[in-house]
């Protein structure tokens, strides 16, 4: 007889996200964490609304979520994972410290649900290196290697 145990997703709702990250509207770019494993990976979503402030200028007749905001959303997802992994004081923050090999493969548009996945590559002396992928409907929109620094 084989007993299988199904892993239950670890969800973090927006109210708890706001206790972990200092960001607020319009710069809080993670709506919900759909699952995570401390020190390893995290998946989350950002529902992209036509009412996002960036769309008034990027671009008025053809709104596209700016690539830097996609990268910031990935960094925020990593920040949530870091706060769930480490016991940190309220005064400590994770700063976006670097980005390498960023590739943008499709635009993210109003109405899209952006899926975020971050995975830790290594962590050393307060610096976390990780990979990030943002996708829509299973199609990769952006992928990059990023770094966050704990201060």
From Swiss-Prot:
Reactions performed catalytically: a (3R)-hydroxyacyl-[ACP] = a (2E)-enoyl-[ACP] + H2O
Principal localisation: cytoplasm
GO MF annotation list: (3R)-hydroxyacyl-[acyl-carrier-protein] dehydratase activity
Gene Ontology terms: biological process: fatty acid biosynthetic process; lipid A biosynthetic process
Listed transmembrane segments: none
Sorted UniProt keywords: Cytoplasm, Lipid A biosynthesis, Lipid biosynthesis, Lipid metabolism, Lyase
Active site: 58
InterPro entries membership: FabA_FabZ, FabZ, HotDog_dom_sf
Localization, UniProt: Cytoplasm
One annotated Gene Ontology cellular component of this protein: cytoplasm
Disulfide bridge map: none
EC number(s) stated in the UniProt entry for this protein: 4.2.1.59
Family: Belongs to the thioester dehydratase family. FabZ subfamily.
HAMAP family: FabZ (MF_00406)
PANTHER family: 3-HYDROXYACYL-[ACYL-CARRIER-PROTEIN] DEHYDRATASE
Function as written in the Swiss-Prot or TrEMBL entry: Involved in unsaturated fatty acids biosynthesis. Catalyzes the dehydration of short chain beta-hydroxyacyl-ACPs and long chain saturated and unsaturated beta-hydroxyacyl-ACPs.
This protein's name: 3-hydroxyacyl-[acyl-carrier-protein] dehydratase FabZ
Native source organism of the sequence: Histophilus somni (strain 2336) (Haemophilus somnus)
Biological classification of the source: Bacteria, Pseudomonadati, Pseudomonadota, Gammaproteobacteria, Pasteurellales
